[in-house]
Amino acid sequence: MQKTNRDYPFIHNNEIIEWDIKSANTSLMRYYGLQPDKVIDKLASMPKSQREISVGKLMRKDKDFAKSLEESFNKIIQEFMDTNNLTWDDIVSVKKDAVFVKNHGIQKSEFGAVHFIPKNQYKHVLLLPKYEIYISNEKTDVK
């Protein structure tokens, strides 16, 4: 579902919050029952880089699991949007494991094992053909 709302190429003086899924792979596996708890617990105990490599190996080994995990990202993003009554006008961009929301309060950020956390806050966004530039008072991020 990765998509950017290009209706507004420059957003100025708005509250834009990046809502990121914490430990996305393992939390989605747990929420949707994609792996046994024992496997998920083992993965969750690993450092992030090792966990990502291990999940990648699981996905290469089991194509059905890989497809289910990829679909789970779309499902949980849609659930987050529906539950919080977000329309496309409220969205700046949707990434694999994050939603950039402008000027809209979030009422529910936890869905079982899946936790959306406010990772970054910005005031301005410039959407270019190949880049998204997010600007706050403290920093500039290019996505």
Describe the role of every protein-language-model region:
Residues 1-143:
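Conserved acidic
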